[in-house]
Structure formats: structure tokens, C-alpha cells
Amino acid sequence: MDVNPSPTRQVTLQRVGALFGDWRRLLISFAWFCAASSASLSIAISATRAQAPLLSGEQLILTALSVLGLACANFALTPALIWLRAPINPFVTSGLAVLSNAGLLLVCTDVWFDARLDGAPHPPLTLAAALAFGNALANGAIALDDDYTFLQFVLASLRYSERSAAPSKSRGLVIIEVDGLSYSHLRWAVALGFMPTVAELLSTSHTLARYDSGLPSQTSAAQAGLFYGVNHDIPAFRWYDRRHRRMVVSNHPEHAAMIDARHSTGQGLLRGGVSINNLLDGDAARALLTLSTLAPNAQRAAEHAYDDLIAFWFNPYTFGRTAVLSVLDLVREIAQALRERLARRQPRLDHRFPSRFTVLRMLTNVFLRDLAFFAVMREMQRGQPIIYATFVGYDEVAHHAGPSSLDALATLRGLDRHLRHVLTIARFFAPISYDLLLLSDHGQSSGAPFRQRYGYSLRELIDALTRAEVRVEEQQPRAAGQSFMNALLSEMDAASEQLRGVSRRRWRRATMRATVRTLRPRLEGDGETLVHRPSIIVCASGNLAHVYFEFGEDQRATLDQIEATHPGLIEALVSHPGIGFVVGTTAEAHVVVLGKGGQRNLTSGDVEGEDPLQPFGDVALRALQLLQLAQLPSSGDLIVNSAFYTDGSVASFEDQVGTHGGLGGEQTDAFVLYPRTFWFPQRPVSSAQALHCVLASWRGSALREPLGQR
């Protein structure tokens, strides 16, 4: 990745080699060209020699040479155009293919076989068009999802049709976040062969390190920590704001904008760069599919990368390829869900198919992935100093199939291919030299949901343990993938306005608006607001839940107050087999963790009986993390964490078999993959805020250090 492009013929040849580096694919493609050319030439000869004797030995040799010539011409067309630095797009290549095939067919028949095609039933242009069309269809089927086709028809066209920054000795960072992928699951995916590009990086240029994501182990807290170095008062993915008496949900654009506004100082990690497919913008100058930038109350006005969205949507190859792959992924999800049901695999979600998730998986795992990486590579060609994008497909599938399932790990195969594309762009096409980082915001732990284990939800349990007149409400979750798809529809709606008044783009605008009108009713779910004002509010985020008691006051209720109003509730929760511990505050303002065999005072450090945190890893670290979490202004009066069972599983309070948000298992076990030339601390990194310091130092080093200084 230390080679900068220059306008020399040698570098252009290197680019050609980069585009055509898949030799297995090349052999298959060339074999097809030979077969198609042979068939086309046979038709041409038979049309002119209906009454003529069979071909002589010399003519048979000429026929073989003709087939080889036609195949080579079709095969070398695009590399030749790249070498000449000509604009590449499907229309140019198709037109030149028809003309070149027509000319070669005329030469082969008129000169070598002494026959004229002008009066034949199949004129040369018709045969040439048929040959070119057949080649296009076959190559589309053969190379639907590989480097050769993607780079041939997308990257080259971007390089020569878009304005790129001038070559520079600057350096930049491309950071790809894999939502929900733990350190050990990444290693498992590499060992199983799902991520050959990552395996190659590990063996040549990069190092893999683990870090603890901290509490809560979820995306909004992690991204605030990674981008700004602080994630104050984000107690979970969803919580109750006592002061304003409202629900806050991290993947609602208005609430994401509020989180951004609270934490941004203008010096975020992404300042001057690009945010793609994230919850928060990190002070980026440009953004696409970033939830916090879509809200009317957004305080910062990041430039929306509508041009990337429009270019992707109306490129016949990229959109068509992604649409076909999305449908194939839909078929794959149906097959996997049926196989799981027939095999009676546990744990599993019986409503996995048919459900809204079936469509959401297709859109998040393929469509959003391809769009995000398409935008990443365009922004690399513009020479942006830092680009941060999130892949949400693994997290979405792992929630429904389990983080270690082959269904979830297989989603990483498509991500890995795009990482190879990014590396190719960085080496041969970007105007500056880029370093690639791969990281996760948290991991996931597996296990049957709480409701599936015990027949009722946490809300229903609390409802059963309180008096009849007590109203208990629970905030219903919305899938993260659904929020990003709604973000896509919002971006498309806004992008269509950019096309208003341009006559030659009216059909494009009409197409985008029609798509938005069709998909929005199907994707928009129920809101996450409370209709009534309940006595108790349960906000579950994975296997961690905040429970709020309404006493008419803004401050946190103490354990004594809760016991006096709802006698026996706390003891019943602590003793339940599906609950690992309960955190609350005493009348003396001490934070305590209550477990089945004992308790720990987080404020003083005193332990009575068995330490409730013993099963959850580093006890000192967990105690500090829980203390900090409980002291946040918006944390619940009670914080409930599920049990961590002897088989290593947890019980999500949501309807998930892969979960995160609390403690237990691998949900706090995140990773970062970075170049070996980068510094990384020897001491364990125990939070996203701590990793921000490392990332900020890497960014400063990358932007200061000219090429060749490392």
C-alpha cells in the first residue's frame, strides 16, 4: 500500500494487472470467449458456404486461428482501453465489442475463406451483436461477485469519469468497522477460510489485537468513545431520559443527533473526512447513511454524499450486480432458516422466516454493504484524509442465527472481497497512500432468549412480581438494519431533490422517488414511544436491562424506596435463575451488585459472600465498568444483567440468539487489525474511549508522515 499512482504507462500497466489478477477467473472467461467465438464463426461460415464442400485442412487451421483471434480480441478489449486511459463504462465496451467483432468476422470470412457476408442471412453486425451480448451474459453469470468484474466495470470507470485529487505524498486512513464481530469469532472466520484477505494481511503486514469494549457493549456508546474519546450518559442502546421524560433510542436519527451534539467538540476522529453507514458522524465533513446527520435537529451540517448514492443507483453494472446478489442472499436466508428448522437446531428463532428480518438481511448484508464500499472507494479516489464505514450485515444475521453460526460467519466472505478491492484502490488508483484498519465496536454472545427459556419476558416477570394496579411497560426494539434502511430511503429522497430541474435526469429522479414510495411502508416499523405513563419502565438492550421506577422525582430511586413500594421484587429478581446480578443504589449513595450468593459494594470494594462478578471475567475491571455505568445520570434505578450459564451462553431480554449490551461471554471482546508499523499499547485497552487515543495517534502520524518516511 506504499505505492502511489503516477500518470506513467508503467503504472497504468500495473493497474491493468491489478484489475485482472484473478487467474482462475481469467481462464474460465477466456474459455468462454473461445467457445462463443467458435459458435459465432461457425454460423458465419455456414451462412456463406451452404452449398460448398467441407473445409480443407488449411482452412481448418485458419478457423482455429480465427477463433483464437476473436477470443483474444474480446478478452483484451477492456485492458487495452485501460492502457489507453480511455473512459470505461458498459456502453463504451459494448459498442466497441460489437464493432470489433463485426470487423473480425468480415476479415475471417472475406479474406481467409473467400466468402462474402453482405448478402448472408446473418449480416456481420447481427452476428457481432449476438456474440457481444452472449459474452456479456455469460461473463455476468460467471463473474457475478469477483474482483475481475467488479474492478473492471466499476473502479476503472470511477477513476476516469470522476474528478480525483492530484497525486500527493500525503497518507490517509480507511477504517472499516465490523459491527458485532468479536476477536475470537474473527479468528474463527479466518481459520474457516471465510476471510482470505484478512489472512493474507495477518501473514504479511498487519497485526491483530483485542480490546475490551466496556459497558454498555453496544454501538452508540462504542462509536461515541471511538470518535470523541468520551461516551458520557449513554447507559444502553435504549434508555429513559428522566429529566425530559422521554425514551431515547440510539438508532433514531433525532436521538443519534442528540448524542452527537452532546459529545462533539469539532475535533472528532473523522474531522475533515467521511462517515459512511454509521450511527454518529465523528465531526466528518462528508457523510452518507449516517443516522445523526439525517435528523432535522442535527446541529452540524455535514455535506451529504448524494453524488455517491446517485452514481451507485444509476450505474447499470453496480446496481444490477447488487440487486442480483441481494436476491441470491434472500434465497440463501430462506434455505438457511428452513435447514435450521428441519434440523431442530437450538437455540433458534422459530419466526426467522418468514419475517421482516428476511428482507432486512438481504438489504443490509448485500445492498448496504455494496453501497458503503462503493462510496468508500469513490472517496478514496478523492483523497479524503480519513474514511470510516460500518458493515452491519454480520451483526444483523448473528442476532438471528448466532455469532458463531456458519450463517453469520459466511456474511464475512463478501466483506473480505471488498477489503481486497479497497487494498487494490489504495495501491493503484488512490491519489494518496492509505493504511487500512479493521475493527469492531463489540462482540456478541450466544444463547436462547430469556422468553424462550422461561416462557415470559423480563417485563412480564416484573409485572407478575408487582401489585395489580402497577403498570409495567417495555420499550419495543427496532432492528438496527431497519434504521439504516430507513436512512437509505431518506438519503434517496433527498438525493432525488438534487436531480430536480435537470431534464436529462428526470427519469432518474422519478425512479428514486418511486422506489422510496414503494419500500418505505414496508420498512417503517412501529414507533418506540410509550403511550401511557407507567409506574415501571423496562428498557432492555440485549442481556442488559435498565428498570426505571416512577416516583414523581427526577433522581434515581434507592433500593430501600423500591423495596418499600414493591416488597420482595428485588429479592425475586436476584434469585431468578435467568438473572446473573442486579445493580442498585443504597440510601447512603453506595452502588452495590446483588447476586444469589453474595454482594459487592462497588463504591467501597467490600464483598459479602460470593462475589457476583466472579463469572464475568476480570473482576476489578468489571467492577469499575459497572460503577461508571450505574453513576450515569440516565441509568436505571435497577440494572439487570442476565445469567452467564455454565455452557458459556447468556439469555437476551430481546428476541435474539446472538446478543450484546451487557456482560457475559464474548460481547465485550472486540478487536482491531492494524499495520505492523503502527504503535499499539502494551497494556490492555479496556474501553472504546481508550482506543480513541490510539486511533487519534495513528491518524496524526498518518497525516503528518510523508510517503517513504516509515
PLM regions: where:
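Juxtamembrane/disordered regions of integral membrane proteins
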Residues: 2-126, 130, 134-146
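His/Asp/Glu-rich, glycine-adjacent segments
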Residues: 147-150, 229-386, 390-402, 507-509, ...
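Active-site-proximal N-terminal segment of extracellular/periplasmic enzymes that hydrolyze or transfer
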Residues: 150-206, 453
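Short, structured active-site-proximal loop/turn typified by the sulfatase FGly-forming signature C/S-X-P-X-R
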Residues: 187-225, 229-234
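Acidic, His- and aromatic-enriched active-site or binding-groove loops in soluble protein domains
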Residues: 229-241, 300-307, 409-417, 455-474, ...
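Active-site neighborhoods of enzymes that stabilize oxyanions during catalysis
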Residues: 244, 251-252, 256-263, 272, ...
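A long, amphipathic alpha-helix that forms part
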Residues: 366-367, 371, 379, 387, ...
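Metal-dependent active-site segment of extracytoplasmic phospho-/sulfohydrolases and closely related
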Residues: 418-455, 591-594
